[in-house]
C-alpha cells in the first residue's frame, strides 16, 4: 500500500473513515453493487451513501464502475459497481483489529469459516459468547454445513452474510440481534442458494432493510415474517420460487415498507398480488427481468407510489390501465421495453408525473392524453424521440432528452 493511500485514510473525516472500514465486510476481488453498500451504510450514516462513495473514490480508496445510465439522482444505484483494491481491504481489516484487543468488544467483527473450521474463540468457550460489534460479517465457503454454535449479539445493527454453498440455514442467533437494522445475504456460488430458517428474522423489531443476492426464495416468505419495521426489500439475481397460494391482506404486516427492488430475477414472470397491498410503497423497481410479461392490475391501489421502474423487461407487452390511479407518481421508467405496445390510455391523469424514461420503446404508441402532462421530461433514444417530437407543438413545456445506446463492458463483471 503506497503512502498516498495511507495519507488519504488519515485525512478522512470521521464518517468517511467509518465507511471505509465497513468495506472490509465484503470478500476480496469482488465487484459490489453500489446499492448493497448504501444499504449497509444506511444503518449508521443515513442517506449520504452515494456522496460517501464518491468521496472515497475521489481519494482513490475505491473505484466506481458504471454499468448503465448515471441516473443516481433517482436513488437507483444497481447500475454502479464498486471495487476495492485487495491491499486497501487488508489495510481496512488491520485497522479494525486495532479497535480493541478483545474480539468481542470490536465495533466490526469478521468471522471467516473455511472447511467447517471455526476460529478458536468459537470453540469450547468457558462462558456464553457475547458479541458487542455493531457490524458483523460472516463468510463461509461452499463446504459449509450450516452447523452453528450459540452466541448473543445484542448490539449488532448490520449483518453481512457472504455464503457460497447451495443450501444455507440462517443461524438461530440472528434472533438475538434486537438492534439489527440491515441484513445483506450475498451468495458467491455458481447457482442460487436455497435459504432456510428465515423465521429467525421474524423476531427483529428494528429490521429496516433486507437484501438478497443470488438466492432461491419465495416472494411469499417475506410477508409471512411479519416485519412491521421493514422499509426496503431488495432481490438481485434471485431465483423466485412460484407460490400457489396468495396471502391475505398484508397492509398491516408490511406497514412501513416503502421500497422494493427486484433486479435480474430471470424467472420472474409476474409480480405477486401482495405487493399491491403494500399501500405505504413509494418506489417499485423491477428491472432486467426478461420473463416479466404483465403487471398486475391491482398496482393501481398503490396510491402513494412515486417511482415505478419497469426497465429492461424484454417480454413486457403492456402496462395495466389502472396505472392512471397512481396520483402521486412522479417518475415512470419503461426503458428497454422494445415490445411495449402502448402507454395507458389515461396516463394524462397523472398530474404529478414529471419524468418518463422510455429508451428503446420505439414501438410504443402514445395516447392523446399525454398532452395533458405539463412540464414533462422524456428521456429516450432517437427513434422513440420521434414519437414525442410530433406532440411538441401541443406540449410547450415538453423536454426531450435523447440518449445513445452504449455497450458497457463493465456489465460483464457482474457475473
From Swiss-Prot:
It holds the Pfam family LRR_14. LRR repeats lie at residues 229-251, 256-278, 280-303, 304-326, 328-351, 352-373. The keyword Nuclease does not apply. Residues 239-260 form a coiled coil. The keyword Coiled coil applies. The LRR repeats probably act as specificity determinant of pathogen recognition. Possible disease resistance protein. This is Probable disease resistance protein At5g66890. It comes from Arabidopsis thaliana.
Amino acid at each position: 500500500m503506497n503512502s498516498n493511500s495511507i495519507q488519504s485514510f488519515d485525512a478522512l473525516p470521521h464518517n468517511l473513515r467509518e465507511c471505509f472500514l465497513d468495506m472490509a465486510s465484503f470478500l476480496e476481488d469482488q465487484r459490489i453493487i453500489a446499492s448493497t453498500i448504501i444499504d449497509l451504510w444506511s444503518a449508521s450514516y443515513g442517506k449520504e451513501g452515494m456522496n460517501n462513495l464518491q468521496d472515497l473514490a475521489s481519494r482513490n480508496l475505491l473505484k466506481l464502475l458504471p454499468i448503465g445510465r448515471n441516473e443516481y439522482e433517482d436513488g437507483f444505484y444497481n447500475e454502479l459497481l464498486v471495487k476495492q483494491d485487495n491491499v486497501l481491504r487488508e489495510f481496512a481489516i488491520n485497522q479494525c483489529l486495532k479497535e480493541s484487543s478483545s474480539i468481542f468488544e470490536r465495533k466490526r467483527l469478521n468471522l471467516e469459516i473455511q472447511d467447517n473450521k471455526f476460529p478458536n474463540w468459537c470453540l469450547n468457550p468457558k462462558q456464553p459468547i457475547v458479541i458487542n460489534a455493531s457490524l458483523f460479517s460472516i463468510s463461509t465457503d461452499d463446504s459449509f454445513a450450516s452447523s452453528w454454535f450459540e452466541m448473543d449479539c445484542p448490539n449488532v445493527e448490520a449483518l453481512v452474510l457472504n455464503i457460497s454453498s447451495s443450501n444455507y440455514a440462517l443461524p438461530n442467533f440472528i434472533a438475538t440481534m434486537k438492534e439489527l437494522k440491515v441484513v445483506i445475504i450475498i451468495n458467491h456460488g455458481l447457482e442460487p442458494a436455497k435459504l432456510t430458517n428465515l423465521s429467525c428474522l421474524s423476531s427483529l423489531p428494528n429490521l429496516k432493510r433486507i437484501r438478497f443476492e443470488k438466492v432461491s426464495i419465495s416472494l411469499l416468505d417475506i410477508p409471512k415474517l411479519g416485519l412491521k419495521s421493514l422499509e426496503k426489500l431488495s432481490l438481485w439475481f434471485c431465483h423466485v420460487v412460484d407460490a400457489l397460494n396468495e396471502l391475505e391482506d398484508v397492509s398491516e404486516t408490511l406497514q412501513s415498507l416503502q421500497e422494493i427492488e427486484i433486479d435480474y430475477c430471470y424467472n420472474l414472470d409476474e409480480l405477486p398480488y401482495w405487493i399491491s397491498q403494500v399501500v405505504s410503497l413509494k418506489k417499485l423497481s423491477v428491472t432486467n427481468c426478461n420473463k416479466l410479461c404483465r403487471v398486475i392490475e391491482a398496482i393501481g391501489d398503490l396510491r402513494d407510489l412515486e417511482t415505478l421502474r419497469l426497465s429492461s423487461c424484454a417480454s413486457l407487452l403492456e402496462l395495466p390501465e389502472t396505472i392512471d390511479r397512481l396520483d402521486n407518481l412522479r417518475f415512470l421508467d419503461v426503458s428497454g421495453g422494445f415490445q411495449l405496445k402502448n402507454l395507458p390510455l389515461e396516463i394524462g391523469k397523472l398530474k404529478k408525473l414529471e419524468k418518463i424514461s422510455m429508451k428503446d420503446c420505439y414501438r410504443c404508441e402514445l395516447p392523446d392524453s399525454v398532452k395533458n402532462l405539463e412540464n414533462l421530461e422524456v428521456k429516450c433514444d432517437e427513434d422513440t424521440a420521434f414519437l414525442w417530437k410530433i406532440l411538441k407543438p401541443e406540449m410547450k413545456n415538453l423536454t426531450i432528452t435523447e440518449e445513445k445506446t452504449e455497450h458497457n463492458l463493465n456489465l460483464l463483471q457482474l457475473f
